[in-house]
From Swiss-Prot:
Keywords for the protein's UniProt record, in alphabetical order: Plastid, Ribonucleoprotein, Ribosomal protein, RNA-binding, rRNA-binding
Protein's UniProt name: Large ribosomal subunit protein uL5c
Function: Binds 5S rRNA, forms part of the central protuberance of the 50S subunit.
InterPro entries: Ribosomal_uL5, Ribosomal_uL5_bac-type, Ribosomal_uL5_C, Ribosomal_uL5_dom_sf, Ribosomal_uL5_N
Subcellular location: Plastid
Amino acid sequence: MKNDFFNYYKTKIIPQYLKDYNKKKALEVPVIKKIVISRGIGKANTLEINNYIEESIKEFLIMTGQKPKLNRAKKHIAAFKIKKKMILGLSVTLRGAKMYAFLYKFINIILPNIRQFQGIENKQFDSLGNITFPIYSQSNIPELPYNPRVEKRGFNVTINIKAKNVSEAKALCAYLGFPII
C-alpha cells in the first residue's frame, strides 16, 4: 500500500502541483514529514490504569504497526494530582513506509467511517499548515474489534506538513484526497 500511495504522490501529485502552481522544481512541492498519533490517559481510574494502558498499547500496535511511546510527567504538580514520572499518555510517530500506509488508510477508510464528517475545516490547520484530527472513538478503525462493553477511547492524529504557508498545505491535502470545506 505504501508503494502505491507513495508512487501516486510522486507520479501524479507532484507533476500536477508543479503545473498548477507554476513551480519549476519538485522540491518546491509541500511534503508530509510525519504523522503523530496520540492518546491521553485522562480520566482512567487508577485501579484500572494498567489495564487501560495495556489495551491502548495493543490498539496502537494493531493500528500503526509500531509500539507507542509512553509520555510521562516531568515533574510533580500537586494541583492536578500529577506525580513525577506518572504516565500521562501514549504517542506514535510514523515516518516513511508506515506513514504512507497509514495515510492511505486514514484518507480512504477511517475518515469516511466517521459520522457527520464533512471535511477539513480551516480551524484544523495551524499557522504552519499542520492538521490535527480528533478521532472520538476507536470503533472507526476497521482493524480494531468492536466491543460494546469497552468505553469509547479516542485519539488525535496530527499530520506534519512541510510547506511555505497554509494555502500550500491545503492544496497538498486537496491533491491527496482530503475533503476540504
